[in-house]
Amino acid sequence: MAQEVSEYLSQNPRVAAWVETLRCEGETDKHWRHRREFLLRNAGDLVPATEETADAESGARSRQLQQLVSFSMAWANHVFLGCRYPQKVMDKILSMAEGIKVTDAPIHTTRDELVAKVKKRGISSSNEGVEEPSKKRSIEGKNNSSVERDHGKKSAKTDRSAQQENSSGSKGSSTKSESSGTSARSNSGVSHQNSSTSEGDRSVCSQSSSNSSQVTSAGSGKASEPEAPDKHGSASFVSSLLKSSLNSHVTKSTDSRQHSGSPRKNALEGSSVSVSQSSSEIEVPLLGSSGSSEVELPLLSCKSSSETASSGLTTKASSEANISSSVSKNSSSSGTSLLMPKSSSTNTSLLTSQVAASLLASKSSSQSSGSVASKSTSLGSMSQLASKSSSQSSTSQLPSKSTSQSSESSVKFTCRKLTNEDIKQKQPFFNRLYKTVAWKLVAVGGFSPNVNHGELLNAAIEALKATLDVFFVPLKELADLPQNKSSQESIVCELRCKSVYLGTGCGKSKENAKAVASREALKLFLKKKVVVKICKRKYRGNEIEDLVLLDEESRPVNLPPALKHPQELL
């Protein structure tokens, strides 16, 4: 058929010239050969008979010609490109192209053909039979999750109620045991005090030591108990017991004043009051009562004990009884001073002042009274020295802690020696950076002063997903800088990447300094190869090791000083 068309055009050159005017620009010979046949088959009366008629075409004729050209192009697109058009257009162009044989047209499979093939094979499409099972599964999953949540809530509630019952039971048992323990302790203390009145001086000393040991054990035992409300309850219970014991001691002291019979009884009563004083002074702070009770209760007990002591001294008694009572008082006060450094100084001052007053009023022997005063003052001075030493030790511990903290904060990094392993880790990155910088320089026309060196270097490093580290330091802070730098160059800039030194620059501003440093760094990439080496640099007057980027031929001589310690940046 193609031969027939070519023969026809050779016989009618006028028609051939007219058809050539309908060819599109850039249309291939194969497409044009088949589309030309389509035009000639359906042209009919549109082919001009003479040149005059071709020039004087009417409007209807031109519209028909444009429609024919459009149909021919649609048919060519459908045959060679696989384009699809509305059904009316497809029917029209296929009917117009009957009889045209296209042997070398490509094969295009449409969507309908693919769906038909899939259905023939028995494979269901992705949209069929999927929605209902998925809905059912989602509903079943929701129901199962809701049931599991209900079971979890019920089990959590039962666990919480069981824990609360156990905790309440343990709290009740602990409070009961504590109250029984405190009542037993108070009863034992009262029985010991009653028995002490009928015994001698040795029994009094043993009683005071046993009471102090019992109090310390009780204090340690209660300090280990973790519950705060039980502590407050026991403290209030003990404070009420202490008030009742104080009232009983006051009545006993008044009775002793009225019935001042034998010196033996007065001494024993004074020793019993001192024992109660030591027990009250020790129990109050250990059981966790308030600070006011710590101060007020010892003062009251001191007054009662000093009054009994003065009454015992004013009576004409033997010196041995006075000495024994004073020794028992001083021993009890020393025990309290070791456990209570706060109230010891006030107790000793009251004792010394009242003993001095009793010495002026009494007619007893000066040696015994002097021994009492000297013992009390020595004990007071010892307690003060102990408190001072403890305070000094505590204050010495505080600055040592602060200095250790400051030293730990100042040392942020540990210096380690650089090895060849560090070079092996860094070298592959700079080999890739060398190629990237080379391509960037080619893109901007090579290395020249007109190029923004800082932006070019930063872009090359960011292309490899790394960052350019920039550090600025005023020139005044660098003592290792060469002396040929002028005073106007007041800013120093250092460039690093991957903890490797690239270059240093000085300038009037930060931008100028960074530009100079970037230019010096880019000069390294103009050589044949860049190498990471371990070199020595100066940092605050000391030589340190640093990773430096150099070209293969150069040797590190007079490197600029480091602005920051390299180990800090690793």
Curated annotation (Swiss-Prot):
Q: Where are the transmembrane segments?
A: none
In the record, the note on similarity to other proteins reads:
Belongs to the CARF family.
Q: What is this protein called?
A: CDKN2A-interacting protein
Q: Say which species the protein is native to.
A: Rattus norvegicus
Instruction: List the keywords (alphabetical).
Output: Acetylation, Isopeptide bond, Nucleus, Phosphoprotein, RNA-binding, Ubl conjugation
Where on this protein does the Glycyl lysine isopeptide (Lys-Gly) (interchain with G-Cter in SUMO1) crosslink form? 176
Q: Which GO terms describe its biological process?
A: DNA damage response; negative regulation of cell growth; positive regulation of cell growth; positive regulation of signal transduction; regulation of protein stability
Lineage of the organism: Eukaryota, Metazoa, Chordata, Craniata, Vertebrata
- Kindly give the InterPro entries that the UniProt entry links to this protein: dsRBD_dom, XTBD
